From Swiss-Prot:
Listed name of the protein: Uncharacterized transporter YetK
Domain of life, source organism: Bacteria
InterPro entries: Diverse_Substrate_Transporter, EamA_dom
SUPFAM superfamilies per UniProt: Multidrug resistance efflux transporter EmrE
Membrane topology recorded in Swiss-Prot or TrEMBL: Multi-pass membrane protein
Keywords noted in UniProt: Cell membrane, Membrane, Repeat, Transmembrane, Transmembrane helix, Transport
Gene symbol of the encoding locus: yetK
Family: Belongs to the EamA transporter family.
Organism: Bacillus subtilis (strain 168)
A single GO cellular-component term on record: plasma membrane
Subcellular location per the Swiss-Prot or TrEMBL entry: Cell membrane
Domain named EamA: residues: 38-163, 187-314
TM annotation in the entry: 27-47, 56-76, 90-110, 119-139, 147-167, 176-196, 206-226, 243-263, 270-290, 294-314
Length: 330
């Protein structure tokens, strides 16, 4: 009589190793998504400073011009050229550029001028919930219970930051118009996230970022040229121009690459929860850079957001599908 391991048991180490690689890749996607939204959150603060002396269309046009040049150089150095695109890919990239670049940038930068930062934060905090709902209706993605709980936690956390923090009672003329612009920006961000799931899987994150930046530049170009023709270039300081450079290299090149690196590896409902990092990042940086009040309720709100992300990405321990039983053979 002798014993030998069953076929399943002998392959178990390889199966576990493959599972570990998948988990590591997914965790890498989570880190990329969170980092991307933290950078985009900084754009709210930097954008408020930038548009004080440089018009929205001109600054945005310059931003995407610089970003496109950098991304094109990286794409040709690393991938040696453009990937093959289908008509569907081109359409999706154009829609993404219009909604998540052109529409989002214009509505956000103009919106914060007409409404309070508090109300802007309240509205942008609904992005994760909107993405989760749209992913269910448009992409037919099932919303798991833990994802729904995570979305609600994140939304509650960011709304707590904005509703009960300092300045929540401030009013601004034309606030309704500003709020409508912020809502349009939120819709653009949600569609931007969802459309990424429709691209061909062979297109790299770098290539997608390059195309989106190029198309975004083309959308802004005619309006940027119009503003450039009458702009007084002696008004902005070196610091003002550095805001444009930051927007180009970090908010566009780096954040786009990180976002596309992660968004194609997880469900839309899960990637949507990470957009809650955006307003949290904006609140923290507003306190550090703009010296706006940072209160205890902000810590509570941030804890809710982190808790929501944790609930969403945590994995249940799976039972061992390959028990340690051995087979006996003669």
């Amino acid at each position: 009589m002798k014993k030998r391991l069953s076929l399943d048991r002998r392959f178990l180490p390889y199966i576990k190793k493959a599972g570990g690689v998948l988990v590591k890749k997914q965790m890498g996607a989570y880190v990329s998504l969170a980092a991307a939204m933290a950078i985009v959150g900084s754009s709210v603060v930097v954008g408020k400073l930038m548009v004080e002396r440089i018009p929205v269309f001109l600054s945005s046009g310059l931003r995407f011009l610089i970003a496109s040049v950098v991304l094109l150089m990286l794409l040709f150095c690393i991938e040696k050229g453009f990937p093959a695109l289908t008509k569907k890919d081109v359409f999706v990239l154009l829609v993404q550029s219009f909604t998540g670049v052109f529409l989002f940038s214009i509505c956000l930068l103009y919106g914060v001028q007409y409404t309070t930062g508090t109300e802007s934060g309240i509205l942008t905090s609904t992005t994760p919930m909107l993405i989760g709902i749209l992913s269910f209706f448009l992409l037919r993605e099932k919303i798991e219970k833990k994802t729904l709980i995570g979305i609600l936690l994140a939304v509650c956390g960011v709304m707590a930051i904005n509703l009960f923090g300092a300045g929540s009672q401030d009013g601004t003329p034309h606030a309704l118009f500003g709020n409508m612009l912020i809502i349009a920006a939120v819709i653009g961000e949600a569609l931007f996230t969802l459309m990424a799931k429709l691209l061909s899987p062979h297109i790299s994150a770098l290539a997608i970022s390059t195309f989106v930046s190029l198309f975004g530049f083309l959308f802004f170009l005619p309006f940027a040229l119009f503003e450039a023709s009458s702009f007084d270039y002696s008004v902005p300081t070196v610091l003002d121009w550095s805001y444009v450079l930051y927007y180009a290299l970090f908010v566009t090149v780096l954040a786009f690459y990180l976002w596309y690196s992660g968004v194609t590896k997880v469900p839309a409902g899960v990637s949507g929860i990470f957009t809650s990092v955006l307003p949290v990042s904006a609140v923290i940086l507003s306190g550090v850079i703009l010296k706006e009040p940072f209160e205890f309720v902000h810590f509570i709100g941030i804890a809710c957001v982190i808790g929501g992300i944790f609930v969403t990405v945590i994995k249940k321990k799976q039972p061992d599908a390959y028990p340690a039983a051995e087979e006996k053979t003669l």
